[in-house]
Amino acid sequence: MATKLIKHGSEAREEMLKGVDILANAVKVTLGPKGRNVLIEQSFGAPKITKDGVTVAKSIELKEKIRNAGAQLLKSAATKAAEVAGDGTTTATVLARALAREGNKLVAAGYNPMDLKRGMDLAVNTVVEEIKKSSKKINSQEEIAQVGTISSNGDKEIGEKIAKAMEEVGKEGVITVEEAKNFSFDVEVVKGMMFDRGYLSPYFVTNSEKMVAELENPFILLFEKKLSNLQPMLPILEAVVQSQRPLLIIAEDVEGEALATLVVNRLRGGLKVAAVKAPGFGDRRKAMMEDIAILTKGELITEDLGMKLENVSIKSLGTAKRVTISKENTVIVDGSGDKKSIEDRVLQIKSQIAETTSDYDKEKLQERLAKLSGGVAVLKVGGATEVEVKERKDRVEDALAATRAAVEEGVVAGGGVTLLHTSQILTKLKVENKDQQAGIEIVIEALKDPLKQIVENAGENGGVVVGKLLEHKDKNFGFNAQDMQYVDMIQAGIIDPAKVVRTALQDAASVASLIITTETLIVDEPSKEEPMPMRGSGMGGMGGMDF
């Protein structure tokens, strides 16, 4: 077992905060419409250029163990914000650093860290409630485009394409992003279906950066029962291997020996495979599997019809242009089912909706109808070089996630203005415990930092702009860093999803609280590199090489 390095008190926190600063300084330059790019060296291929805060954060690992612990904690705030709201990662990073720095100063001055945390939590909850109250629902295509534009760092085309995609498939519809093979940026609507079941093992993942399994032109096996033994499937598996195409297995469950065997074959590269549970329960599960069978021109292997796995041929398998599987969802794009069969199935479901008297059944049937007939919108992102395409695709994915968040919880004034103005509500929040009151003061000051950083990235003095905005009572009055003018942010279309702002603050406060309440830190002690043995010849420095 490796020996451990143990640090206590302010010494541990100060060293962690050095790591926090290193990561925050790399991420903060991307904030706002005039934020800068960050170039990241990759282990292979061209360097990556990005303005995405979480991509920058994820790329950072520090050599010093204690500093790295601080950096990794800060990284978790950005990552959580990206997972929950899809955006706000840089804001979360800037807020977390400000909260942790100020909190640590007070702990060093003798304040109780647990009471500071309670005060911070009280302040954060008050701000979150205010954000929810002041959020405005968005309905028009223009408003959706505005959110997409701001989240993609002012790229109007991205905002407009996302709005168009949402118009095509509905706000709740499935929208995916992929790289185009030309210069253009287009929206294409294809036949497709998404259901809420993810991969049964993370070993099926093919894209480790996004933690998704991507299968191009796969066969799709639909089996009504549980799969616990692959012996009956061997003939069909051999046929799939010979075809050199991937396989998606959708069954009631895949467990035990069957799952282990699939994972081993996937890791050895013999069979490109992924397995997911079938969506729904009971009779509804069977109906949804039949929908998938029609969509992919496959057959549902069910013992009710006397079908057995050992007798299944490759003709019984469905096919699709592409399948993407995340931890929680599976998206089947462009199944090869014929139009007439799909239309007949849609009419059948519509007649069932008309006949049913149960609201619950009606809702579930309408969900099936939307999945079968709604289609999938694909945003095809092009560019002049591979580096440009990847950078733009990252921004499109961020903007899409932010737009979904805006549809879900509404929008507030953007550009850090909402956080700044809600900080003034906290000045009226008083508690008897002086340490908790100090925790509230920490949050008041930290809420000014995102706007300061946006302004400073645009080349102006952040403190001066913050002071000028706080003189105004209008909560929507802010600074447009793109045009360098003071405007009504809502009227100017500078809006942020309420969910993004809320999540950024909550995740930042969570991480900062962990840092200021840490009293002991235990990490692996760095190994001391042994000196290389000297050789008799003049090439002594080569002694450590082993061929």
Swiss-Prot record:
**Keywords for this protein:** ATP-binding, Chaperone, Cytoplasm, Isomerase, Nucleotide-binding
Enzyme Commission code? 5.6.1.7
Q: Localized where?
A: Cytoplasm
Which portions of the chain have biased composition (kind: Gly residues)? 537-547
Question: Which coarse location class describes where this protein primarily resides?
Answer: cytoplasm
Provide the binding site for ATP: 30-33, 51, 87-91, 415, 496
Q: Where is this region: Disordered?
A: 528-547
Query: What is the protein name given in its UniProt record?
Result: Chaperonin GroEL
Q: Which gene encodes it?
A: groEL
